[in-house]
Amino acid sequence: MNYWHSAIATFGIGDTVTTIIGLSMAGIYEANPAANTILGELGLFGIIAAKVLYFGLMYIIVKSMPEHSRKYGPITITVLGTLICLWNIAIIATQVLGF
């Protein structure tokens, strides 16, 4: 099984899409200082470039690990991406529902 697909789907695409949706709504801002700086300086292109760079770096690191351990890199990214997506969705839902 290629664990990178789920990592890209959650952290790469899911986080990016939910962030874009959230930031398009009044009252929602980027809480991550690094991402906020990148967004302010380079916009959406900067976020996508940072994610591509991050995935490239993680891929190199994972490839240098023993083969039996390689799946844990993308699995960790998938868990992180899932949690971030759920957080973003909760923030968006809170704004939409007026909580």
From Swiss-Prot:
The chain crosses the membrane at residues 8-28, 42-62, 73-93. It is a multi-pass membrane protein. GO terms for cellular component: host cell membrane; membrane. Keywords: Host membrane, Membrane, Transmembrane, Transmembrane helix. InterPro entries: DUF5658. Its main location: host cell. It is found in: Host membrane. This is Putative transmembrane protein ORF13. It comes from His1 virus (isolate Australia/Victoria).
